[in-house]
């Protein structure tokens, strides 16, 4: 049974996920600026994946009658990024933060479509994060 509380919770989950993806896209811009040149394609692919998920979330939000948030001009980076190592650390943090968002998303939505979307987002972020942690020599 879908109630108004359920709709508000799903709406909140969608809007939070959009914000998380907007922050990830911004942070990947910082990663790109400091990354090892050998990782340029990987960074571009990950950025594109976050854009695609954000765009899908915006469409889902709009279809639900919500007004999706626009991206902020800037987002706070959790630590200074000054070289390729700190850029990779930021990328790992981006994916960890995104995974946390999708974990909460799955708990807050009630439709199979949205749960599947959240599980896919969680899985994708976990895989990307494991790749970055592996590149850093830390255990996934």
Segments (PLM) and residue ranges:
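All-alpha RGS (Regulator of G-protein Signaling) helical domain and cognate RGS-like helical scaffolds
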Residues: 1-140
